[in-house]
Amino acid sequence: MIQIKSLSVGARLLPLSFELKQGQVTHVIGPNGSGKSTLLEAISGVGDGYKGDIKLDGQDLSELSLQDLSLHRAYLCQSARPAFNLEVFQYLALSLPSSSHGLDIEINAALDEISQMLDISDKLHRSIQTLSGGEWQRVRLAGMCLQIWPTLNPYAKLLILDEPAAPLDIAQEALLYKLIERVAEKGIAVIMANHDLNRTLRHADQVLLLEKGVLQTSGSAEQVLVPEQLESVFNTQVKSISVDNQTYLLFG
């Protein structure tokens, strides 16, 4: 259980409270500048200037060293490609938990499963500098998953993803959501910033709706993704339709 109580970051994020349960997928939604990245950075433990309490199974986040943090959570921020050059498999090796409990056979099994799910098995010996934006993002995602994969790291509790689908095409995005579902099935809590509200409608167990640093509402996707509520926050027309018993949101 991850508990966030009265968390704030100056004027960028006003006090909010919520919980993240193991195996639960939480989407943070809202317009650009609403505080999504600020919230995720604070929860990751690397952000400065936050006030309030963030507890991982009762342990205060501020009391953890960076090494301990890396065992409990993985954080995929919005980031440019690194200046140094490595092959993909070397980069992924650096992503393994600092005190990996896995044997070589377990590491290889985890790498094989994650690489296949993200369709990067044929890229392990490529230079990271030669990858496209979508390929590089999938490699970064693989690294984050290796860091918190339960067979390699029994201390892992949380995966934090800041707009992970942004560089991905439609097919790659589908791979991403299957991977997130797999991570959640392993008992890891997942929290992610997301702009595709139809994906949120289908894949989120919990939704946090932010506007100008304020948590407007939270709850299930069905409770939060109400057209009237979304119109007020996003300042655009929203319509809900049903096709083959599946609900979709239309905008504009």
UniProtKB/Swiss-Prot annotation:
This is Vitamin B12 import ATP-binding protein BtuD. Its EC number is 7.6.2.8. GO terms for cellular component: plasma membrane. It is a peripheral membrane protein. It is an enzyme of class 7 (translocase). It comes from Vibrio atlanticus (strain LGP32) (Vibrio splendidus (strain Mel32)). Disulfide bonds: none annotated. It is found in: Cell inner membrane. GO terms for molecular function: ABC-type vitamin B12 transporter activity; ATP binding; ATP hydrolysis activity.
